[in-house]
Amino acid sequence: MSAPTSNDYSTVSAYITEGIIFAYSGCRGRYTGKEDYVAGAPWCVTDLKSAIRYLRYNKEILPGDTDKIYTFGMSGGGAQSCLMGVTGNSDLYTKYLEENGAAMKDAAGNKIKDNVKGSQCWCPITNLDTANAAYEWNIGQYFSTDTRTPDTFTKSLSDDLTKKFVEYVNDIRLKDPKGNVLTLTETNKGSYYDYLKTVIEQSLNNFISDTSFPWTKVAQKEFPRFDDFGDLPPLGPGGPEDSGDSGESTTYETLEEYIASLNSDKKWVTYDSKTNTATITSVEDFVKKCINPSKDVGAFDDLKRAQGENQVFGTNYDTDNNKKHFDEMTYSLLNDNNDKYKALSDYANYINDFSNDLYKVDSVGKNVLDRVNMYNPIYYLSDHYNGYKTSDVADYFRINTGIFQSDTGNVVEINLYLALMNYGKNVQFTSVWEQQHVKAERTGDSDANFIQWINEIEKTNAPNFSKDINISYLVILVSLFFLF
């Protein structure tokens, strides 16, 4: 991507008027368009870590407290913000930082660190090692169109990915806020399923309590997808706000009318006017009414390498193919079930494509699976993985997501929230009803709410806190803050 062509004070004024310094370092995207300038994982996060190290190297001549750095991001930027929060000082990044020319030691010879204090993540696209399976369990299993048409190879793969996700949930043993281990006894039964249903109901009930009627539903703009060589937006947080207007709208005069619209195909929402709360019949009914699958089977690691994530794990210098497969779970299914799959319609053999890609090494000698681990927050947070407790994780996280989105499964963000909470971190998690893949907030402005969250953290830690000494740094998509 090219650098932004303009900087506009109005896009960052909300931060500056609060005494926050907005640092705009920039970072590589998934592809630079140049064979001699590699991008993708883990260079995007490496660039941001390098920026933090630069600021800390120069902390004596720059304003701000470099122990109070916050990041933020939306979508892929939300993932990078999360990674900045989770991967602090991870040794896995050392060789990349050195190749990047990052500051590794200060003038006195002390190691410079790249950990941060807090991360804001809107709709983070994370946990790519299981994202294909999570998408099929959360969304794909409930549909029978396109690549999920019955009696096709891809439908069979979808079913098997769904089963793999059940195995993963039972292996990772996440706990709910009450400390109960969440498991699946069958595909759609068990405490994990019940917890997801509870999250959906809480999101709906938040909407009911937050919303005044008459209420107008406005179709939202999609999050902008920058092409391989497109320009970054002007200086600022980026990403669409909660209610971008696409020109289509529907007004509901009463809450009862809105509930009736949800039940227009079948009754799956029950509203109790006495308690002003609602319940749902099942996750399936919610998904079928509120979410349409926008991705084929292989939602992130596409069988034909057609997704943006395939380019994230590509290698620019490999001119024959700068997109790579990265999902070992999908590969194992293709390999183990090939005889079953090849008897079905639409079959194509992708086994060699996967096996060739997964072990392709980059310029520092790391293969694709190593790079997937580096870009998987839960790799550092769960004892299911070898990376458990090998990084300095931020103390504070704020994760907001639109529960109607089809860009990723809701369970990906829920798993991230639970893993951080189980790790002992302070996490605010909000899944917002009637919001899609946007900077989702229950109420108010996303930037203002983010700033308020930071101020609340700093007030708690400093009784004499004042915005006059609230000094911070940010960057586009994933952004850096400093505070005094």
Where do the PLM segments sit?
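Primarily recognizes the serine-hydrolase "nucleophile elbow" in alpha/beta-hydrolase
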Residues: 57-142, 224, 229-247
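Long, low-complexity, polar/charged, intrinsically disordered or flexibly structured peripheral segments
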Residues: 190, 194-377
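Short, surface-exposed "cap/lid" segments of acyl-processing enzymes
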Residues: 1-14, 30, 405-415
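Short beta-strand element of the alpha/beta-hydrolase
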Residues: 1-4, 70, 397-398
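C-terminal GPI-anchoring signal of eukaryotic secretory precursors
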Residues: 459-474
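Alpha/beta-hydrolase active-site loop
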Residues: 38-61, 448-452
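C-terminal catalytic histidine-bearing segment of alpha/beta-hydrolase fold enzymes
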Residues: 131-135, 173-272, 398-405, 414-417, ...
